[in-house]
Amino acid sequence: MKKVAFYTLGCKVNQYETEAMLELFEKEGYEKAETEDYADVYVINTCTVTHMSDRKSRQYIRRMKKKNPDAIIAVVGCYSQVSPEEILSIDEVNLVMGTNDRKKIVEEVKKIDASRKVSTVDDIMKVKAFEEIEINKTNGKTRAFMKIQDGCDRYCSYCIIPYARGRVRSRDLESIVKEVENLASNGYKEVVLTGIHVASYGKDIKDSDIKLLDVIKQINDIEGIERIRLSSVEPILFTDEFVEAVSTMDKVCPHYHLSLQSGCDETLKRMKRRYTTEEYKAIVDRLRAAIPSVSITTDVIVGFPGETNEEFDKTYEFLKDIELTHMHVFKYSPRKGTPAATMENQVDPSTKHDRSEKLLQLNEENFNKFGQKMLDKEFNVLFEQKVGDNKYEGLTENYVKVIVESDNDISEQILKVKIKDVKNEFLEGILV
């Protein structure tokens, strides 16, 4: 039996698409190999948000070809969509596919051998329909990613993703419901709604008022699903109507990854973000008032072109003031073809590093404060895996990692836990 291995970089959308492509291979008789193991086919599902992700893809390609010189190396995803010629020029690569037509990957792999090179990348801007590649199987997991949307039309000045993913395309609501019902019947308890710009769901559907809230309401009625979670979302989503609605639905997790990028209005303007810090804070306050247990996490970019010490200080003070549960800190990485890449006053690497370290320290402090508020309180935790001798790891409804000890296997269960201690990036608790 032939083996296929996947190496996945980037966002939850990529994770979903990898699972879907793996299922296509398995239907054709392939067996899954682990990422670093010997395989007949290696599929690299790329990300191109930063130079680092590009480099990781190239390193893996070369490493795996050494492991099996006769293997077929297929590269798909955002990096291959925006730079197909660059990837095809890598000696070890056989097949280059972009961010569309992934349903054909097995068919394309079967057409070639390790001596051939083929690119099927087309103009993503011409693609108008959502590509359906659903997941049907059960694989022993309890939390499923569910891709409901693709594409982005926001064109932030630093971001390459609109060029890699194309225009907004929404998945048919009936298709979403069908897949969630299937996941529920296979034992999944939590569904994470993902997309490139989830808040834009429905805007491309002609003669329809369907929005993301309609998707959530439909899933909320599906028996067997106990949790609904959203992946990264934009501030524009959180209208009074949306906040009021989700605050009354028990299945909707009180956690939102609310993209910020900068806590300075001048920087946000250069980034072409469509909100101010005042508007962002109002949304945070609105969520906290409606959902007292809510956890809000975010992304922040340091060292954006033109970011002065004064601008960074504004970001730091803003983040210190609003005390978000967790933040992912990124050092700005120029992406060819974006407006920010040619802006004046690019920030030097050492300054980016220093600013990143300062925010990471603040991140630890903010998480500790949030964790302290959870001490001696009880939370429902979805346990996903064993992480040591009699130790199991899971997530609370508000997306805080919890570790407990148990003599019994508690994987794939939702159990009540009392929080007893705050550690760096996670909490310790005891089963109630």
Give a label for each model feature.
Residues 1-201, 217, 241, 256, ...:
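Proteins enriched for Cys/Gly/acidic motifs involved in redox and nucleic-acid/cofactor modification
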Residues 139-142, 152-154, 252, 262, ...:
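Short flexible coil/turn linkers enriched for glycine and charged/polar residues
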Residues 331-345:
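Aromatic/acidic polysaccharide-binding cleft in carbohydrate-active enzymes
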Residues 176, 193, 230, 258, ...:
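Conserved, mostly hydrophobic/aromatic
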Residues 307, 323-324:
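Contiguous mid-protein beta-loop-alpha structural module that forms a pocket-lining wall or clamp
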Residues 48-49, 165-166, 205-208, 269-275, ...:
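Short glycine-enriched, charge-decorated loop/helix-capping segments at active-site entrances
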Residues 342-432:
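Terminal RNA-binding accessory module
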Residues 73-74, 82-83, 87, 185-309:
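Conserved SAM/AdoMet-binding glycine-rich loop
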